[in-house]
Amino acid sequence: MNGTPNADPLASLLTLEGVPSGFAAARDGVDALLRDRGLRRTPSGLTAESLLRGAAASGELEGSTSGLETVRVDGGDEIARAAVRVSTELLGLAPLMTSRPLQAFARIHALAGRGALPDEQLGRPRDAESAGRLRALADTLVTQTEAPAMMVAAIVHADLATAAPFASHNGIVARACERLMLVARGVDEKSLLVPEAGHLRLRAEYESNLRAYANASGSTGVHAWLLYAIEAQTVAAELSPLRD
């Protein structure tokens, strides 16, 4: 990222082949879905259903053995319940994602980790390096950028998932922040997309591209992750309860 004060921290990513056009096409598809179906009928139950589907999928990616129907009936196992806890308070944190993102990260982790960690570890980074990674990400989010919102959401997700700044539940936190960023930046204000389910459907690609993001030198892994994220966001729209 460019260290010049007020410089766009994501500017270099806009030069990666296929990335700007891919996100533009994905956004067009999302906008068409939300305009053509969402604006005509958006009862709150659709948002609740999207959040539940997302929580169940995020739990599975984190290691839960409870599928959606089990979660729907009895809440599922402890990992699934952690993801559901996050989902129930998530949308109320949207304003923080563009103003005080560190507070949003902390609150999401506190919800996910409740009962699994000592209270003093809830919402707190594991160490000084992790705290630095969180601050750097937060600085990126409050700096003006020309990057499309869906790209920013993808970067937030990958940074949190690969840095693993908290003592537990980092994947759940990362996926929740991706959804929340789509809400906060106006892509999906009623949270009707299901990005977590998109990642679950593409699980092998999801996990391999996160590894590439974490381990590849230069921009190679970031480029691969962003191209993957374009596909995943398209699947997230396909899995919206608006399509039922």
Regions found by a protein language model. Give the residues of each.
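FIC/Doc superfamily catalytic core
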Residues: 1-244
